[in-house]
Amino acid sequence: MPDIKTSILIVEDEESVRTSLEEVLTFFGYRTRSAADGLAVLKVIREEVPEILLSDLNMPAMSGFELLSIIHRRFPAIYVIAMSGMFTENQIPSGVTADAFYKKGDGVRDLLKIVEARPLERRELPDTPEPIWVQRNGHDVSGGEFVTIACPECFRTFPQAINDTTSLILDTRCAFCDSRIRYGIVDPAASSFRDVFSRHPLSPTPAL
């Protein structure tokens, strides 16, 4: 049996399948958590990044195809296993970013072989997200300033009202996946990125 600390996050919208996978993998010594769709996964991952992600490809809200693309970019250390009842390993559409594939309906031994093939080395990921930089978009119908933010986790965009005009780095939450986003505002009228920092004399000026 594996080390009890090895964690697997199961992503499956069918509750009966999700529960069965959790029970089987827990029985064989894995520490499991689960989520019903891609957006829910991003919230679960913020609590603890798993060693292994076992994800269905066809799900509501955010498909497995989209989810695996995000995981590949944001959490490259996670070993990703795609699963589906619609495809075989030789029929997976190109562009699916997964380390392995499990066909639904195959035996438990097949699944365990795939899980146990995960490399043991794992690169640690930073706890604090890097800030993104955005420009002011103008004013909303009530006259308030806002910016448009593209979430670095789920890649969806949403408007964000500007309430704090003094801080260099601001915090917000994604309107879709609720992930923490740190962002700074670049004034389009500024002659250069350095001008952003000139308004904050106590902030260090970056090397350009």
Identify the residue ranges that each predicted region occupies.
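Hydrophobic/aromatic residues positioned on beta-strands within the core alpha/beta folds
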Residues: 81-83
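C-terminal output/effector regions of signal-responsive regulators
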Residues: 131-208
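Active-site residues of response regulator receiver
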Residues: 56
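Short amphipathic alpha-helix used as the core "switch/output" element in two-component signaling
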Residues: 65-76
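Two-component/phosphorelay signaling modules centered on CheY-like receiver
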Residues: 14-33
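Alpha4 helix (beta4-alpha4-beta5 surface) of REC/receiver domains from two-component response regulators
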Residues: 66, 85-114, 123-126
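Receiver (REC) domain active-site loop signature in two-component systems and cognate sites
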Residues: 59
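Helix N-cap/capping motif at the beta->alpha junctions
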Residues: 34-43, 64
